[in-house]
Amino acid sequence: HGLGEYMYRHGLKNYGVIVHNADFYATNQRDNAAKQVLAEEYPDLRLCGEVRFENEGEVYRKTRELIKRYPEIEALYISWDGPAIESIEALTELGRTDIAISTGDLDYAVAMNMAKGGMVKALSAQCPFEQGQAIALAAVKSVLGEEVPSFVGVEPITVTPENLLRAWKQVFKEEAGEELTQAFKENPNYVFEK
C-alpha cells in the first residue's frame, strides 16, 4: 500500500517494477502481492514496465534501460533494499531523483535515504524478532504433536518518513543511531513523531 498511497497523495500515475527473477518463495510472494495491490487497489495507476534481475549487479543497468524506455515513470517498486540502492545510483546518474521508490527490508542505507528526504518513500520491513518467536512456537507445537502450518510468516510493517524512527526501534529493538536521527532532523521536511 505504501507506494500506491504515496502516488495518490502526490498526484503520480506511472510506475514500474524491478523484481527478482528467482524461485524464492517469500520474495516471489512479496513481489506478486505488491503488484496485485497496485493493480487492484489503485486502478488509476499505470504499470509502464517490469524488469527482472538475476543478481543485484544487474539492477543498475536494468534501471537505466527501464527509465530510458519509459521516461514517464514516476515511481518504482523494487524487491528489496540492495537492488533499491543500485536503482538509486542509476536514477541519480540519470538526473531522475524525482522518482519515488518503495522497497522491502529496512536497513541503514534505505533508512538514511528516507531520513534525508531521498527517493525512498515507503518500504515494507520484516520483523525478525517476531519471526523467530513464531517459528519457535511452531517448533514447540510440532514437538507436542500439534498441527503446524506449512509456512510461518509475520505481517511486515509499512515504514514511511512519518514513522521511520519508531519502526526502526520496533524492528531492531533499539533506538535509531545518532547519525540516522540527526539526518532526519536536518531534513527540511522532517515530521516530528509523537
Residue ranges, per PLM feature:
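Hydrophobic alpha-helical
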Residues: A34, R52-M114
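Extracytoplasmic "Venus flytrap"
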Residues: I18-Q29, I78-D81
